[in-house]
A protein has these predicted regions:
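A generic structural signal for short, non-catalytic loop/turn and secondary-structure boundary residues
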Residues: 12, 146, 223, 242-244
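A glycine- and small-residue-enriched flexible loop/hinge signal that marks low-structured segments
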Residues: 1-190, 232-233
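C-terminal edge-of-domain segments
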Residues: 236-284
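Residue-level marker of positions within ordered structural domains that often coincide
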Residues: 22, 216, 256
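Acidic, low-complexity glycine/serine/threonine-rich segments
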Residues: 172-235
Length: 284
């Protein structure tokens, strides 16, 4: 919670997206409500299976839209143990870099530098497959799974996601929310040195046109879809605010959704048997 607060309008300006973890074990004394599927070992309660992770997330309010929640941990070939958030952030930064710094793509289904899932030294869990990983995803938990002949980050959602219960499409995918933050941060970075200059009509139009140009460029590279619109409306800029030197531009746009799943509907037909009868092509 402290990280989320710290990452909200840093220095009064900048938006940041938090990647955090659910624990694989916690001191039993810190648990107020029973965690479904958990087991006690000594003075600790193990959060070492899918059901326990989902229950712990719900009980402890890991549902903020500005964060991505990861579970479990991972271990590499040399025995080093990493938090899921570390592995996810590594993939996220690499993915951003491949897109020229634009957070248009989720780190989900990107390579993870581990050789196994890790649930803590006291756990007997040997791991889970993609089916159970999808159960975690449905609860807004990002995980690590063996898929496509390699270990990969799995889950494109924010912590606010819960299958069938999301009313705000903006918070479904991590890249959607991060794109909104990116656009807001870019606006502030672009015009920071203009603050306290005379706000002429020409400058107002320059800002609007430049932001529209940037929005159209994001469409061109696939970061946004449709036709984003930048506005400067009288209804959003009252005389009282203008007198104070406060000006508001509006942006409306649609981040490109990830290809979360694809289905090919395969049907059988006996129409092909017709080729055995009638004139064959080229027959004389």
């Amino acid at each position: 919670e402290a990280m989320i607060t710290a990452g909200t309008k840093i220095n009064g300006h900048w938006d940041a997206f938090v990647v955090s973890d659910l624990p694989v074990s916690v001191p039993t004394s810190t648990i107020d409500s029973a965690v479904v599927g958990s087991t006690e070992v000594g003075s600790n309660t193990l959060i070492d299976n899918v059901d326990a992770a989902i229950s712990y997330k719900d009980l402890n309010g890991f549902t903020n839209e500005r964060t991505k929640v990861c579970w479990p941990m991972g271990i590499d070939s040399s025995g080093r143990v990493f938090h899921g958030s570390t592995i996810t952030m590594w993939a996220m930064l690499n993915t951003d870099e491949s897109n020229n710094g634009i957070p248009m793509e989720s780190p989900s289904n990107k390579d993870a530098f581990i050789t196994a899932q890790y649930f803590g030294p006291d756990s007997k869990n040997q791991g889970f497959d993609q089916t159970r990983a999808n159960d975690l995803n449905a609860a807004g938990i990002t995980t690590i799974v063996y898929w496509g002949a390699r270990w990969a980050i799995w889950g494109p959602h924010t912590a606010a996601y819960k299958f069938g219960a999301v009313t705000d499409p903006r918070v479904i995918f991590d890249n959607s929310l991060r794109m909104m933050m990116y656009i807001s941060n870019s606006f502030q970075q672009e015009w920071a040195m203009t603050i306290d200059e005379p706000m002429t009509r020409a400058l107002s139009d320059t800002i609007k046109n430049r932001e529209q140009e940037k929005a159209d460029a994001l469409v061109a590279v696939g970061a946004l879809i449709g036709k984003p619109v930048v506005t400067f409306e009288e209804s959003e800029n009252s005389t009282a605010e203008l007198v104070e030197g406060n000006f508001v531009w509006g942006f409306e746009g649609t981040p490109t959704p990830p290809f979360k799943s694809g289905t090919l509907q395969v049907a059988y037909t006996d129409a092909g048997f017709d080729t055995y009868f009638g004139e064959a092509e080229g027959e004389v």
